[in-house]
Swiss-Prot record:
InterPro entries: Homing_endonucl, Sporu_reg_WhiA_N_dom, Sporulation_regulator_WhiA, Sporulation_regulator_WhiA_C, WhiA_LAGLIDADG_dom. Keywords: Cell cycle, Cell division, DNA-binding. Belongs to the WhiA family. GO terms for biological process: cell division; regulation of sporulation. This is Probable cell division protein WhiA. Coiled coil: none annotated. GO terms for molecular function: DNA binding. Pfam families: HTH_WhiA, LAGLIDADG_WhiA, WhiA_N. Involved in cell division and chromosome segregation. The lineage of its organism: Bacteria, Bacillati, Bacillota, Bacilli, Lactobacillales. Residues 272-303 bind DNA.
Length: 303
């Protein structure tokens, strides 16, 4: 599973969002058609779970029953494309979400109310990422988050919205549309917090810290850094086991005293056992830290 898919699947397991989230979803992946002298709305995605999420969202919000259709792409990837198809109440949905002008090309940016309200902004960013966003796998060491927009002014409004949350967002225009993007790891982690993907934020941070620790080892070229590298090497097995626990049963399933040691070990892979002991909220002995680390390793080995 790609990291992008992992984030999106975490988002759809959160409680259903508000109208601002749905507005972003429809604005970025919806299209209008005319059949039997009435409008119909199509919302497309390549993820079946997201299609079901959108289906339930519309069904619950407007008490109508959409339809899910799919077809196979004819390109080399041959992915399935899922379409949430709405025939009833389309005019009501467009009016309620203030999207009519957007579909007819009169207003392609983001509603001022969304740009001025933090909660509305968070919901809109969640919907925008869910339907048109991607994150480069942090394992690659090259950090990038992107959201694709058909219109440049929408991409620029997205950047403005992100900047409200102190993110260094930029835009770039392509022939087929425009992209709003983040390239700093800290900005991407903050974005994940803003949209509610807390588990993926922790995974991203753990991977980033692990990569940095490995890079520190590779750069060790004198006695001092060699000693740090030795400490980091000794902690790698435990850090990998902590990540394994995060990916399976979750760190929150551990007793609080093990959670505290695990969080410190991942955050500070260069710390000696004594430094970990001293950094705890209630400092303990080196043997106490070693005992807790052995417990963490055993839990991971048993998974």
């Amino acid at each position: 599973m790609s990291f992008t898919t992992k984030v999106k699947e975490e988002l759809i397991h959160l409680s259903t969002g508000d109208n601002n989230e749905l507005a972003a979803i429809i604005k970025l992946s919806g299209s209008l058609g005319l059949a039997h002298q009435s409008l119909h709305l199509s919302i497309t995605t390549e993820n079946a779970k997201i299609a079901r999420y959108i289906y339930s969202f519309i069904e619950d919000a407007y008490v109508i029953v959409p339809e899910i259709r799919y077809h196979q792409k004819t390109n080399l990837r041959k992915n399935r494309v899922y379409t949430v198809y709405v025939e009833q109440g389309v005019e009501t949905i467009l009016a309620d979400l203030k999207l009519a002008d957007s579909f007819f090309g009169l207003e392609t940016g983001i509603e001022p109310q969304v740009l001025s309200d933090d909660n509305a902004g968070r919901s809109y960013l969640k919907g925008a990422f869910l339907t048109a966003g991607s994150i480069r796998d942090p394992e690659s060491g090259k950090y990038q988050l992107e959201i694709y927009s058909v219109y440049l002014d929408h991409a620029q409004d997205l950047a403005q919205l992100m900047q409200k949350f102190m993110l260094d967002a930029k835009t770039i225009e392509h022939k087929s549309g425009a992209v709003t993007y983040l390239q700093k790891a800290e900005d991407i982690m903050d974005f994940l917090i803003i949209i509610g993907a807390m588990s993926c934020k922790e995974d991203f941070e753990a991977i980033k810290l692990l990569r940095e620790a490995r890079n520190d080892i590779n750069r060790a070229n004198n006695a001092e850094t060699a000693n740090i590298a030795k400490t980091i090497s000794a902690s790698m097995k435990t850090i990998n086991n902590i990540i394994k626990i995060m990916d399976t049963i979750g760190l929150e399933s551990l007793p609080i005293e093990l959670q505290q040691v695990a969080q410190l070990r991942v955050k500070h892979p260069d710390y000696s056992i004594q430094q970990v002991a001293d950094a705890l909220e209630f400092p303990i002995t080196k043997s106490g830290v070693n005992h807790r680390l052995r417990k963490i390793n055993k839990i991971a080995d048993d998974l």
